[in-house]
Structures are given as C-alpha cells and as structure tokens.
Swiss-Prot record:
Pfam families for this protein: Calpain_III, Calpain_u2, CAPN13-like_C_EFh, EF-hand_8, Peptidase_C2
GO cellular component annotations of the record: cytoplasm; cytosol; myofibril; nucleolus; nucleus; plasma membrane; protein-containing complex; T-tubule
Subcellular location: Cytoplasm; Nucleus, Nucleolus
Protein name, UniProt field: Calpain-3
Chain intervals for the UniProt region annotation (Linker): 587-649
Record-listed Ca(2+) 2 binding positions: 705, 707, 709, 711, 716
List of residues binding Ca(2+) 1: 662, 665, 667, 672
Residue numbers spanned by region Disordered: 1-37, 603-651
Region of interest called Domain III, as start-end residue ranges on this chain: 418-586
Gene designation: Capn3
Amino acid sequence: MPTVISPTVAPRTGAEPRSPGPVPHPAQGKTTEAGGGHPGGIYSAIISRNFPIIGVKEKTFEQLHKKCLEKKVLYLDPEFPPDETSLFYSQKFPIQFVWKRPPEICENPRFIIGGANRTDICQGDLGDCWLLAAIACLTLNERLLFRVIPHDQSFTENYAGIFHFQFWRYGDWVDVVIDDCLPTYNNQLVFTKSNHRNEFWSALLEKAYAKLHGSYEALKGGNTTEAMEDFTGGVTEFFEIKDAPSDMYKIMRKAIERGSLMGCSIDDGTNMTYGTSPSGLNMGELIARMVRNMDNSLLRDSDLDPRASDDRPSRTIVPVQYETRMACGLVKGHAYSVTGLEEALFKGEKVKLVRLRNPWGQVEWNGSWSDGWKDWSFVDKDEKARLQHQVTEDGEFWMSYDDFVYHFTKLEICNLTADALESDKLQTWTVSVNEGRWVRGCSAGGCRNFPDTFWTNPQYRLKLLEEDDDPDDSEVICSFLVALMQKNRRKDRKLGANLFTIGFAIYEVPKEMHGNKQHLQKDFFLYNASKARSKTYINMREVSQRFRLPPSEYVIVPSTYEPHQEGEFILRVFSEKRNLSEEAENTISVDRPVKKKKNKPIIFVSDRANSNKELGVDQEAEEGKDKTGPDKQGESPQPRPGHTDQESEEQQQFRNIFRQIAGDDMEICADELKNVLNTVVNKHKDLKTQGFTLESCRSMIALMDTDGSGRLNLQEFHHLWKKIKAWQKIFKHYDTDHSGTINSYEMRNAVNDAGFHLNSQLYDIITMRYADKHMNIDFDSFICCFVRLEGMFRAFHAFDKDGDGIIKLNVLEWLQLTMYA
C-alpha cells in the first residue's frame, strides 16, 4: 500500500434618463439557472480564529516529491483520493471504476509526446467540453501552456506518482498537487484522454482542475471563459455574433496575434451550459447514459490490447451527446475552440477562413472548406500546405467566415493581462483588484429595481485621473474595462450553490463629494442616473464591459439581480492610464466629544486582585468619590448641594427607582440592572419591546463597568441610560412601521447616526451577529450592539495612548478584555 503524503494547494508567487427606469429582466446566458446557494466564506479574520494555534506550513510540490523519492513510495493524495468521493457528489455511480496509474494502463507512458497540442485532447464521458475547448486554445500559446503545466514532469526520470499544475484563482496563482491515479473502465480512461493512448498530460490536467473544484461532477457544464480565465488570469469579452461589429474578423485576427484565447458556440434555445444535459435530465439519468455508452463502446472489443505500448491513436468512447447535432455537422449547445484565422485564394478571390476544433476529437463541419470538401481541388497546392489541409477525423476543420457568422451565435475572447503574459507588443494596462462580499440583510441589496436596498450594496470609488493617449481622438476620454466575477459557486455546487445573476452600475460622484469615502445613501441613487452600466444582468461567473468616460470620480456598484443573495466576488478595473479603485467607507472612527475628559485607564478584574496595580493614588481617591458603600467610603452617599434642585422629575424618579433596587450600597448587578431597565422601558409603550434579557444586561455591565467590580454604580448606570435614551430615538426613527424592530439594511445608517463610522466588513458582522432570520433587529439586540460598540471604542482609546490607531496587548490583557465583555 503506498504511503500517504499530505498534498498542497498553495498560492504562488452613455447616460440614462434623469429618472432611472427599472433594470430589464436578467438575460439567460449559457449558464445554470440562478438561484440561492451556500453563502460564501466569512472574512478571514473570523475564520482564522478557528485555525490551530501552532500552524504547520503546507508542503510544496518539491518537498512532497523529494519525500516520496527518499521513501521510495508513490504519492497518494488524501485530499482528492482515488475513490467515489472525487467523482460524483449527487449520486453513487452504479458500476465500479478502477483507478490506475498510467504505468498500469499501458507500457511506456509519456507525459507529453512531441509537444502538447490541440489534438491531444479528446473528450470523455463528462460534460466538460467547455474546459477542453479552453485547453485546446491554451496549446496555441506555449508560454501560457507551460505556466499552467510546469516543465520537467515525466513517468521516467524521478517518477514518484506526483504531478502539479498551476491555475489563476481570483487574483492569485495556486499550485495544485495531485497523484496520477485516473478512473478507468476496461483499462480505458473514462474522462479526457489523448489521441495517443500512452500520453497523459490532458487527463492529469483535467484531474487537477477537478480537484480545484472539489470533484469531477463539478466540471459538468460551464462556459469556456471560466477555464480560459483560470488558465491565464485574463479578462473575457462576449460578442453576440448577430450584433457583432462590422470589423469582427479584424478583432478576431488581432486577438490571435496577441495570444488571446477564443471560443464559440451555437445556442440551442435551452439556456444551458455547454456540455450539460437537456432540461429534466438529472445526474442519475446522465450516469445511466454513461453506463450504456460504455457498454456499447469499443471498450468491449476483445481484440483491444490492454497494455498497448505503441504511440498509435487511442480508441476512444464517443462522448455522451446531449448537444444537438445539425445536418451540417455542427453541434448546438457545444463549445468549440477558435484555433486560427487565415485568408485563402480561391478562384482568384480572397476568402476569409476560420479554423475551429471540436473537443470531442471528432464530429466536424461538412460544408465548404471542410476536410472532405470537393472544391479543395481548386485550391493551390502551396495554399493547401499553408492551411495544413488534411482529411483526418481529429475534430478540427476550416470554414468560411461567412458560414461561421451564419451558424454560430456567441464568441468569447479572453484577453491576456500583464499577470499572465508579458509582451512588448501589448499595451500596458493598469489593473485594480478589489475583493468583496454580498451579505444577506446588510450588503446584498439587489439591482436598481429595489431602491430601498440597492444603495446598501458594496460601493467602489473609481478615480479616472488621466485621459487616453489618442492623437486622433479630440474627446477628453478615459478608456477602461470593468469585470465583476463571483467566487466559488462551482466548488459549492454540492452545497446547493448556483451562479447568481449579476451586473453593475457606474455613477459619477458630485464634485463636492470628491475625496469623501463615505457610503453613498439611498437618496443619491433615487435622484441620480447612472453614467454607465453592464449591458445586462446575466447568470454567468463573470460579466465584463468596456467604457469610455471623462476623467472624474465615479462609484461602481456591483450587485446581484435579486436582493438577499449572499456570495463573494472580485471586481477588476483595467484602464489604459492611471486609475485608483478602492472600496468606499474604509475608515473606522467614532465621534468624540469636543471637551477633553480625563483619561481613565482600563481596570481589569485580576488587577484589583493584585493590589490594584493599574490604579494610582489619585485614581483611587477619585474612585472613592464616585463609588460608595461600607467597603469604599464607610458611609452612605450624600447629595451635593443644590443637586436635588437641579434634577428633573425624570432624574429624581430614576434615582429613586435605582435606590429601591440597588439598596444602600447604590450598586447593581445584572439581575438588578434588568429590573431597572425593564421598569423604565415598559413605560414607553411605543417601543413595543419585551424588555432586555439577562444576558444583555450582563454584557452591558461588562462593557460599562469602569473599575472591574462586576457591578454598576449610579453614575455608571446614569451614563448608560443617557446613551440608551439617545439610541432609543435613533431606533424609533428607523422603526417606521412601529413593529418594535428595524430592517437590518437600515442598521448601517443607524450606526452612523449614533456616531460610529465603520467599514463594510464590520457592518456585515453586525448583521450576522444581531439580525434574526427575517433580517430584523429588535430593540434589545439594537441596544446591545451599540453598548458593545461604545465599550469597544472606549477600551481601544484607553490603550491607544499615542493616538496612532494601534494598540499592543499581551495575552493576559487580550483574554481579560475579550472574556469580560
């Protein structure tokens, strides 16, 4: 049994009308149906608190490889094991696959034979033609290819059953390590295979990509652009061919010259992802078809040599075909790679040609310029050689550009960025990357059709600082491209996640608000039209679009079409000239009284047990004036001269109630605080609250107690009550329906009105902590939140002696501060 060694997935180095109308119904792209889904991961600051205290650094591929060689074992990946868990998550497969390493499948296995090329990719029994079309495009650019497929991997020299591949994931390059066990049936690969039966780079690349997304099933159905971007870090543009610009062929030629990746498809009218099954076909039916396909395939051929050692083409399974094959040989609902563009002389005229490839490795176009076209005899021999014309069933074919435009409906071009490929021929673009999150009840506001919540979406300020360098353009214009990408939806499919329908809008910030990073409020969006926006909201992983706007300051608002949909995203802005893109509301502060107050140090409970080390003599004397009781002053508190006369009726009533409950020591515990607060609050019938809970009162004491006694005196309680009264007014202002609750989306404004200025992450955390399942916050939770904010800011400022916004705590101080809260 091979020894198991831990793997790694480690990072590598035009304006609308004045009154905006509703957003049109979202477009249905070639993607899965938009819907709810598992929420994205919470912020790293929260996740990291559950990490082991002593972290173990993940081993790199080199370390794992070296360890396997030293121990003379073959690597076995425990994170993506060779069993059913790595295959399908929705249903158990009815037949048993045998996981084999390439040396067990054939003699003389090779990683790459004669260079990786597009004919090395033949689709197996998985609906991932979108992925394979992208891989075929990748082979056209060797520098890109070997960024994804690192050099020096083989089945001979230093072979240890371990391989690795690199993918771009939301702004970072990650190294994915796998073992080389592959699923087989009758000694044949079930999924992607090469045209040569002893070549395995494409099968292993598919496995690494499946691991990245959790399983092979997760690769079923998708858009070519997803894989293109994961291979390059580029940004994709979509073209509806029927609405294509007149110079589309020129655009495609330029894309080929620049090393961009291109894919195309024909709509089948079902609004499904490429390679998925027709409506109503579930995973069980898909598996049943796969079984029938295998049983009827050439795999049952008794003459098949299970350990063929030559490099002859492998005998492949015809893929499970859900796509609709047309009479012309093209397939609807299927992804093709665009592998070349040329102009050929035919009967004295130049004809524009497009070369395409079907990832099945078979089933080709049978019209003009196809492999078997009868009029090839009229094409010059040198021209044939230049076009590499040969009659072979390899899935690749030429067709005229006119036929291409007539039959195909969508074109996808993945443009490379500086992150993926450096070239002197390409213009340098400035790239800004922002990560964000839509949180239900706080920042998942939906599109402009939902004005009450649209303004709560994350907002990103964009400063276009310099105009384009275009001597032929008299306009003062900045060119830029915005790309919004949702994260982890494919990986979370097994948890019920689907792609959301997403889009964005761009608004110009008024000059008087330039430099102000505050979150723009609802009224701004009610009375200002957007300057630009995505063409449509669509359920795809990424939506992108080019814009040309004058230099100014703008705000980009990314959103889902429907509100309350929770997920993570990244927002990328590419511009020809310098720009600055950052999230609005990124400063944290609290409004402080103008009058300076004496800086009292924070007193920990343990400090009082240790001779009050943090208290000076002056502080103790001052405390003695405030705190009363036999153990502090030895006598009952005496009112100051004229104090009673100055007290209002409410204050007198307040003091009397407090005295009745607190007793002679004039201090109250959590139970007594609960009685005091609820006695007073119950008189305010308009609040419609059930009062404060005991746990809430314990938190109030912990956060308002200035000396660590675990109790509140009259002065401390009076300070608390003044705050509660002020916060009560804010609560009533936002409780517009007098239900005793406020909508969690309004909490941002309420917190701001109370003088606390937070960033988006903190507003998200407040919503998760205090809102109920209906996204409402009751009076008790509302006050608890504000008490906690007040106490936390007060504690921080007490430690921040030099006012630089940074404090240093030892572990005892940290535990005391957080435990007693």
